Amino acid sequence: KNVIGFQEKEGFKVAGKFPKLVGLTDGANLEIHVLKLGDEKTATKLKLMQVNAKKKTQILDQSYIHTVTGFSYLTIFVNDVEQVIKNAKKHGYKPHAQSPQILPPGLPQDVCLLMLKDPDGNFVEIVGPLTEKLKNR
């Protein structure tokens, strides 16, 4: 949230039998964190679920997007890619591979893609205006 600029809003908890009844957990309680990108009514909201499970989680090798099945990729559109890069570095993250890059020919050329990886190894694609470095290529 601090890297991209999300603001944490009031979250909620889901306990009791419900998480198991709908197939989310094996009975463990959920704590849902709600993040919002901007103050507008239509601003993007992201809900992250934290599970208080007694079982140890399995760490997977997510070197590339195709090395695991399931969701491992999230795209977020921002107004300032350079600010995201600064925030990422401040929190110990660096751009993944050789990103940011201008989109390939045939796609908008005034937009760049920054790839980050979250602490769980998921890919977080940041799309927004070109950075100064890319503008001056």
Segments from the language model and where they lie:
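Short beta->alpha transition motifs characteristic of CBS
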Residues: 126-133
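Residues that form or immediately flank small-molecule/cofactor binding pockets and catalytic motifs
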Residues: 13-16, 53, 100, 131
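Flexible, disordered linker segments and immediate boundary regions flanking tandem C2H2 zinc-finger modules
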Residues: 136-137
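Core segments of cupin and vicinal oxygen chelate
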Residues: 1-43, 90, 107-109, 117, ...
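Hydrophobic beta-strand residues in large extracellular and virion-surface proteins
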Residues: 35, 46-48, 126
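Vicinal oxygen chelate
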Residues: 40-43, 50-120
